[in-house]
Amino acid sequence: MSELETLERTLLAEIDAAADEGAIEAVRVGALGKKGSISELLKTLGSMSPEERQTRGARINALKNTVTEAISARKTALKDAAIAERLARETVDISLPVRSSPAERGRIHPISQIVDEITAIFGDMGFSIAEGPDIETDYYNFTALNFPEGHPAREMHDTFFFAPDEKGERKVLRTHTSPVQIRTMEAGQPPIRIIIPGKTYRQDSDATHSPMFHQVEGLVIDRTANVANMRWVLEEFCKAFFEVDQVTMRFRPSFFPFTEPSFEVDIQCDRSGPIVKFGEGKDWMEILGCGMVHPNVLRAGGLDPDEYQGFAWGMGLDRIAMLKYGMPDLRDFFNADVRWMTHYGFRPLDMPTLFGGLSA
């Protein structure tokens, strides 16, 4: 066996034995580098006669080509093996369901959704949003709203009172959002068109009551506001909110200290099934209270009742959410149960609009 044949077998064996790219690179440098075995053979051609150089040069170049091709093939094989090993290690079962993102799993609470729905409806009518503090003075929560000291209507509210301060004044957790009406009248002149969503507090807890609950009120003050205007506003709201083409409403005389006359509003519905259907049926469901703003309330807000008049209404957000979406127990709103939220909650990007659908 000639010297070149022996070298070829040795190099090919080393190439086959190379287990990684580092090993194959070492073989390449040892054979084809500046001081490699094949490179050293090529250097000897200069001392040979032309005839020997032609014969031996061809054989050395053939050896060089064979080794180069073997190295290239081994590199490719090593890369393919590495990819196959990685795929086997990182196998993914494409039949498994895709894991949803946190944004997809999260839900908007029904109360937040209801507030957005109501804001969209009244915003389209030209109303703005007003807010006020949860901790109120006795004056704003009662006296300014025509609840004088000792008035029996004060007993209608199981109020959370704070201990008296250094001045002897007892603040309260507001029992309704109505104090914001007084603050708004004090802050600016009519015309006023506002809605007031917010938390309220009363000492009551059962399937339909909670110590902390949510209300929304509306207030319109100008020189010509009347009961007919109020009826139209409430009818348009009910049609948009309950997503029906027509509603039949019934106004029953009632009493609230801050309005005169006062009404409780019922809406026609069908209660024969598990979910109340509005705009049809022979039943009635009370949904809100309303009335013309009492002259004493206008005076407390700094307005002249001989010049201005207005109407107001209020409703419980938790209750109308239960009616609209068929939720059986108010206490579930505050239990932070992920299962309940997954069922009754709304997707984060499903913002309610009058044109796209309130509860899409």
UniProtKB/Swiss-Prot annotation:
Keywords, in A-Z order: Aminoacyl-tRNA synthetase, ATP-binding, Cytoplasm, Ligase, Magnesium, Metal-binding, Nucleotide-binding, Protein biosynthesis
Principal subcellular localisation of the protein: cytoplasm
Cofactor note as given: Binds 2 magnesium ions per tetramer.
GO biological process, one term: phenylalanyl-tRNA aminoacylation
Residues reported to bind Mg(2+): E260
Entry GO CC: cytoplasm
Top-level taxon of origin: Bacteria
Keyword Aminoacyl-tRNA synthetase carried by entry: yes
Gene3D superfamilies referenced in this protein's UniProt entry, alphabetically: Bira Bifunctional Protein, Domain 2
UniProt enzyme class: ligase
Cofactors, names only: Mg(2+)
EC number: 6.1.1.20
Catalytic activity line of the entry: tRNA(Phe) + L-phenylalanine + ATP = L-phenylalanyl-tRNA(Phe) + AMP + diphosphate + H(+)
Gene Ontology terms for molecular function: ATP binding; magnesium ion binding; phenylalanine-tRNA ligase activity; tRNA binding
Subcellular location: Cytoplasm
Subunit structure as annotated in this protein's UniProt entry: Tetramer of two alpha and two beta subunits.
NCBIfam families referenced in this protein's UniProt entry, alphabetically: pheS
Family to which this protein belongs: Belongs to the class-II aminoacyl-tRNA synthetase family. Phe-tRNA synthetase alpha subunit type 1 subfamily.
Protein name stated in the entry: Phenylalanine--tRNA ligase alpha subunit
